Every structure is written in structure tokens, then in C-alpha cells.
């Protein structure tokens, strides 16, 4: 049918007017004029004449267009009977469409009359063709008169008709996915084609309608070669959206309303969908990163939440704080405390904090992700009490560093049972007072652990108001167990199988806890075993300063232990911190000697143990002549001071073992130290009178 129609096609405008309406519609379909089945005869003649003027430019790219255009079926021409059913009056089209395109409709004839390049004229005229029915009827006469003088060879129209056959298929929506759809009428095929090809006609229609794309002129890309834009998918998608809008105007109102709505909803093409998908993927990625989020579980409370009270020691770090619920070392059940809450309640490191948390049921605190283990801690909801007192916002607290230190004035008596010789010997040769800073200098295997246990039990027996803290650093696990079972006090331990950081962390938090108690006016006694091992731990954990002392001791590693030991003091208006620390000597290590030399002059009380006595199994192995207390007259009465000085004069003339044997034998013969001093005073005076 295509061949016969092309042979009967006239070569001028007058011949077009003599054809019947069905023949004009078939010719318009071959030439690729959109909406030809719905035009009147005069409009068809005008559209065909306008289209024929751009033929010379189209022939130049015929080969390229034939390679790019999709293959079309042989019989695609709409029947003539479909024209009367699909024809719609121009008055039914929206008036806003006509006003919006008024400038575009008048630009094409002017460009052709002024001698513009044929490519621009053809672009403007092909844009005008599907819109011509929306203009007034009197315009068709002027356009027809201009077209009668412009004839084109029939061969050019034939080649252009073949090239436009595939384009018309995409324009009219008559490209069928099955062979049985060719017999449908033009209107039904048009509407069905719109629905079937809606998903993928963006790319196909873009290649077929680039010549008629009304936006190509606005884009301004390759104006002189209009066919170059057929390879641009972006312009093709623009053309598909424009053409769908035109067909929604020309398609009548029976199904056009639903078609318009569906086409508006599906207007985004593949590129738009891809952009949305990429945006959604980015948002999902941000959400996943947000879920990884903080390691602290900060939950909002509701009325139905069940709060669980927790208590522990507050450990304030650089940017956060934790309540150590399992002791003085970090644990999995620690509770997070924000710095804002720390500032609000004036909290300090070492405070005993009590407050509720909102635990999550069935949630594990250990999370595995990203190849590393993360711990998620519950956050403290509020603070109920601090150091046994109700929490107050912005309290006025005493600072430990501003308290006035004094020499010890109140004595801590160690004498309990008459049969316990060790505490009685210490009570005589090295009396201990509240706020004492004492060193127990001991070689290995000299019985320092037994001395510490006896001192702890004696203090707790005679002075129950004192808060006793036994700090064991780098000790044997069995010794820790023995201390926990034998000492009635707070045992804070870090065994030697733990890293050096744990030793230093435990010691720092323990001394800060003691300071907080002293600020409240309490008397605290800290027994440290040992200061030498604590110095070794700081030497390993502290960052190197570059100044190494003899024995491999870093100079900066000695300051934290001295700060720990220097916290001991007697406060002027109440409260005291007593520290008795052991120091190892005669170990054969130069490092131990350096550490001991740093602490030798810092204490105001020294109890020295002897290896020579310990090897002979003489306990307590106390070197009587080398032990003593500074300012002991502040702890003893005047009579006691006189008697002890006389006793020391006698013992200083004896050897180490003889002096200890004499002292212990006299102590065993008496029931108390007071009775012993009475005996010593009588014996010394009597022997002196005999001389």
C-alpha cells in the first residue's frame, strides 16, 4: 500500500488539495506527521506542504537515519475509517496550550521566508506540524499558499517516507509487540500503543522524534546538523516527554484523562529513575552509617520503663566518664556518665555515685561488627546520691589540694592481743599516727606481707571509724585471695598477670577515692604493696620522655608514684589520709634502688625489715635501730618519750639480733606495752644506779 500511495502523491500544493482525506492521512502517516489521522483536510494539506520543504536536508542524512531508526513493520498505515472516529475539534484543546506555543508557531514561516538555513526551517516546521490544529483556521490558508510554490522531487519524498516510517510507528504508538495487533483501528492502536510502550519508548521515540523535538532549538546543540541530536539520549528523553504531552492533548477525552494522569506519574525516564535510585542508595548508606553510631545507649525514658539502680566509683576521663560497677578497673557492666552531668553535679574522679539506668531487655552489650568488638554501655539516667549524700546541682565542695597538711597528732595504736608481738614492736619503735606517710623497707622474703596484714587488722580493731583500703599492685593471685579473706577492709588488687596500664589505673582511682573521703572529713588508711612495683608499672605505661636514669628508669615515670605517696597528710580541721607503702630493697636490681632512693626522704615514718633476721626465722624481722618516726613526740606522751629514748640508747649498743631478742623477750613477759615501758624504766634506772 505504501508503494501505490507514493506513486499517486502529487508534487505540488494543488495536487495535494485534490486528494481525498483518506489519501492525505495515509501520506501524512508515511511522512511521519504526528496527529495526521485527527486533522481536517485543509490542515493536512498545510502540514504536508510544510513538511516537504525540509526534504533536501533530510536526504543528506538518509543513510545515517536508516541505520539508527528502528525497523518498522510493512503495513503500519492507519485505515481511512479511523480518521472520522479519531477526529477531535480544536476547540476542545486547552487554551493555555495554544497561548504557550504561539511564539513557536509563528517562528517557522518567518525563518523560511528570510532565507535561513534549511535545517532551522525544517526544525521549526516539524515542531509546528503536530500543533497546527490548535491554531486558528485562517492560518491554514496562508500556509497553504506558501507551500504551493515549493515542490520536491518524488524520489526525495519516497526516501523520506521510508525513513519516517519507523518514526511514525513510535509517534503514533502503533509499534506492536505481537503480530495480531496490526488490524486494530487508528485510535485504539494509538491509545494502546501509549500504554504498552510507556516503559521503554523514551529511548526509541527519542531517536525517532529528534527532528521534531521542540526543545532542540532551545538546547542549541548542533543546530546546523539536526540529525546529530538523534544520538543524544538526553534530548531523546526530552522529546519523548514532549510528544507524550502532545498526544495527551490530541487523543480525545474518552481515555485521555486517565492517560494524562498516568503519563504525568510516569514522566520520569530511565535516567531520572537512576538518579532517584542513586539518591536512595546514598540515603540508605547514610542511615547504615548512622546506625553504627555511638557506643553509648542513651535512651529516652517513658512511664513504663523499669529503672535499675547502680552504684560504683566514678572514673572521669578526657571526654567522658564511667561508673565502675565491678571494682576499680574497667568492666563490661560499667555505666556511661556524660560530661554535662559531671559538671552539673560537680562530680570528681573517685566519687561514689548511685543512680538508676534503663536496661534493655534481651539486648547484648557485646556487639560484633566491622571486624572489631564494640561494647555498648548503658547511660546513667540521673544521679541519686554522691558519696552517700543526696545529689545537689553545682555544690560547693572542698578541694583536697587546698587543705592544710599538718604532722600527725592522733595516734593509731596497733596493740591488740598480748600474744601478737609484731604490732606491739611496731607500736613501740615506729608509732603510726593519722596522716602518716610511712615506708616499710623490706628485702624479699622478709615478711612484709604478714606485717601489712597485722597492721590492717590492728587498725580496724582499734579504730573502726577509719576507712581501710588495701591496694595490691602486681601481686600474686593467691596473696590477693589471702588478703581478701584475712583483712576486714576494702581490698583493691591488680595481679601481676594484668597489663601495666591496669596497675596504674587502679592505683590512681584508689587514691582519688581516698581523697574524696578525706574531703568529707573521714580518716582513711591506705596500705600499698608495693611502691616499687607501682613505679615499674608507670615506667612501662607512661610515655617515654627521653631522659633515662640509671637502671633504665624514665625520669617521668617517677612522678606519678611520688604524687600517690605525697597525698598522705593530716588535715588541720578534720580528716586524714595515711599511706603505708612497702619498698623493695636488696633485690639486685638497679631500678629498684633508684626507685627507693626517690622515696627515701619523702616519708615521715620508716619501718625497716632485715633479711638476716628473716633467714634465721626471727619474726617480726624488724631492724629496731634503723626504724623510727619523725616527730614522734607529737604522738607519745612526755613520759613515753623519755622511756623510749632511754630504751633506744640501750638497744643501739647491741647488735641487730641481740637488740631484737632483748626487746621481744621483755614484750613477751608483759601483757601490754604500758607495762613493758614501766618495766623498762625501772630496769634502766636500776642498772644505771648500780653502775
UniProtKB/Swiss-Prot annotation:
Q: What does this protein do?
A: Facilitates transcription termination by a mechanism that involves Rho binding to the nascent RNA, activation of Rho's RNA-dependent ATPase activity, and release of the mRNA from the DNA template.
Species, as recorded: Micrococcus luteus (Micrococcus lysodeikticus)
What sequence ranges are listed for the domain Rho RNA-BD? 307-390
**GO molecular function (one):** helicase activity
Question: CDD domains attached here?
Answer: rho_factor_C
Cystine bridges:
none
HAMAP family reported in the protein's UniProt record: Rho (MF_01884)
- What family does this belong to? Belongs to the Rho family.
Under which EC number(s) is this enzyme classified? 3.6.4.-
Per the UniProt record, one Pfam family is ATP-synt_ab
Query: What EC class does the entry list?
Result: hydrolase
List keywords of the entry alphabetically: ATP-binding, Helicase, Hydrolase, Nucleotide-binding, RNA-binding, Transcription, Transcription regulation, Transcription termination
Biological process GO terms, please?
DNA-templated transcription termination
- Give the compositionally biased regions (Low complexity): 65-92, 105-119
The entry describes its oligomerization and partners as: Homohexamer. The homohexamer assembles into an open ring structure.
- Name it: Transcription termination factor Rho
- Is the keyword Transcription assigned to this protein? yes
Extract the ranges annotated as region (Disordered).
48-303
Compositionally biased tracts (Basic and acidic residues): 50-64, 120-158, 188-273
Q: Which PANTHER family match?
A: TRANSCRIPTION TERMINATION FACTOR RHO
Q: Which residues bind ATP?
A: 433-438, 445-450, 476
Amino acid at each position: 500500500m505504501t508503494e501505490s500511495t507514493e506513486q499517486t502523491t502529487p508534487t505540488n500544493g494543488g495536487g495535494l488539495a485534490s486528494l481525498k482525506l483518506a489519501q492525505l492521512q495515509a501520506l501524512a502517516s508515511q511522512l511521519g506527521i504526528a496527529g495526521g489521522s485527527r486533522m481536517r483536510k485543509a490542515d493536512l494539506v498545510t502540514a504536508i506542504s510544510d513538511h516537504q520543504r525540509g526534504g533536501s536536508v533530510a536526504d543528506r542524512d538518509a543513510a545515517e537515519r536508516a541505520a539508527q531508526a528502528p525497523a518498522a513493520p510493512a503495513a503500519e498505515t492507519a485505515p481511512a475509517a479511523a480518521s472520522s472516529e479519531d477526529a477531535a475539534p480544536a476547540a476542545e484543546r486547552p487554551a493555555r496550550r495554544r497561548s504557550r506555543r504561539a511564539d513557536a508557531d509563528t517562528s517557522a514561516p518567518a525563518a523560511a521566508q528570510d532565507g535561513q538555513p534549511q535545517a532551522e526551517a525544517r526544525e521549526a516546521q516539524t515542531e509546528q506540524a503536530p500543533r497546527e490544529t490548535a491554531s486558528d483556521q485562517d492560518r491554514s490558508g496562508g500556509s497553504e499558499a506558501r507551500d504551493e510554490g515549493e515542490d520536491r522531487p518524488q524520489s526525495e519524498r519516497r526516501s523520506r517516507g521510508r525513513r519516517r516510517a519507523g518514526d511514525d510507528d513510535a509517534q503514533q504508538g502503533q509499534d506492536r509487540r505481537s503480530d495480531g495487533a496490526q488490524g486494530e483501528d487508528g485510535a485504539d492502536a494509538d491509545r494502546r500503543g501509549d500504554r504498552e510502550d510507556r516503559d521503554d519508548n523514551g529511548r526509541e521515540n527519542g531517536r525517532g522524534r529528534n527532528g521534531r523535538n521542540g526543545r532542540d532549538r532551545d538546547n542549541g546543540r548542533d543546530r546546523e546538523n539536526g540529525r546529530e541530536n538523534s544520538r543524544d539520549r538526553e534530548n531523546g528523553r526530552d522529546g519523548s516527554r514532549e510528544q507524550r504531552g502532545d498526544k495527551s492533548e490530541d487523543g480525545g477525552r474518552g481515555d485521555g484523562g486517565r492517560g494524562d494522569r498516568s503519563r504525568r506519574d510516569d514522566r520520569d525516564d530511565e535516567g531520572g529513575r537512576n538518579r532517584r535510585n542513586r539518591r536512595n542508595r546514598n540515603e540508605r548508606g547514610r542511615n547504615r552509617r548512622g546506625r553504627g553510631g555511638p557506643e553509648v545507649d542513651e535512651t529516652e525514658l517513658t512511664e513504663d520503663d523499669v529503672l535499675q539502680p547502680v552504684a560504683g566509683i566514678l572514673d572521669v576521663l578526657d571526654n567522658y566518664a564511667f561508673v565502675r560497677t565491678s571494682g576499680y578497673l574497667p568492666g563490661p557492666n560499667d555505666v556511661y556518665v556524660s560530661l554535662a552531668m559531671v559538671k552539673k553535679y560537680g562530680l570528681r574522679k573517685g566519687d561514689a555515685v548511685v543512680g538508676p539506668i534503663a536496661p534493655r531487655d534481651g539486648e547484648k552489650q557485646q556487639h560484633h561488627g566491622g571486624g572489631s568488638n564494640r561494647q555498648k554501655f548503658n547511660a546513667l539516667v540521673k544521679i541519686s546520691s554522691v558519696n552517700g549524700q543526696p545529689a545537689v546541682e553545682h555544690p560547693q565542695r572542698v578541694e583536697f589540694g587546698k587543705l592544710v597538711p599538718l604532722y600527725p597528732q592522733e595516734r593509731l595504736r596497733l596493740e591488740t592481743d598480748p600474744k601478737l608481738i609484731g604490732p606491739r614492736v611496731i607500736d613501740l619503735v615506729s608509732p603510726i599516727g593519722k596522716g602518716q606517710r610511712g615506708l616499710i623497707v623490706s628485702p624479699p622474703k622478709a615478711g612484709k606481707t604478714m606485717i601489712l596484714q597485722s597492721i590492717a587488722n590492728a587498725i580496724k580493731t582499734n579504730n573502726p571509724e577509719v576507712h581501710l583500703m588495701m591496694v595490691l599492685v602486681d601481686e600474686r593471685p593467691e596473696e590477693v585471695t589471702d588478703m581478701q579473706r584475712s583483712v576486714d577492709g576494702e581490698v583493691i588488687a591488680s595481679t601481676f598477670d594484668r597489663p601495666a596500664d591496669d596497675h596504674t589505673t587502679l592505683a590512681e582511682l584508689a587514691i582519688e577515692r581516698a581523697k574524696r573521703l578525706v574531703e568529707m572529713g573521714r580518716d582513711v588508711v591506705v596500705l600499698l604493696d608495693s611502691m616499687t612495683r607501682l613505679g615499674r608499672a608507670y615506667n612501662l605505661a607512661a610515655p617515654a620522655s627521653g631522659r633515662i636514669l640509671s637502671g633504665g628508669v624514665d625520669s617521668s615515670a617517677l612522678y606519678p608514684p611520688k604524687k600517690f605517696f605525697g597525698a598522705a597528710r593530716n588535715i588541720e580541721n578534720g580528716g586524714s589520709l595515711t599511706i603505708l607503702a612497702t619498698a623493695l630493697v636488696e633485690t639486685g636490681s638497679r631500678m629498684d634502688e633508684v626507685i627507693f632512693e626517690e622515696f627515701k626522704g619523702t616519708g615521715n615514718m620508716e619501718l625497716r625489715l632485715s633479711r638476716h633476721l628473716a633467714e634465721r626465722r626471727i619474726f617480726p624481722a624488724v631492724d629496731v635501730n634503723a626504724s623510727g618516726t619523725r616527730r614522734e613526740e607529737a604522738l607519745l606522751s612526755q613520759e613515753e618519750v623519755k622511756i623510749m629514748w632511754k630504751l633506744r640508747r640501750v638497744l643501739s649498743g647491741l647488735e641487730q639480733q641481740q637488740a631484737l631478742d632483748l626487746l621481744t623477750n621483755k614484750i613477751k613477759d608483759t601483757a601490754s606495752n604500758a607495762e613493758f615501758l614501766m618495766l623498762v624504766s625501772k630496769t634502766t634506772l636500776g642498772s644505771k644506779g648500780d653502775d
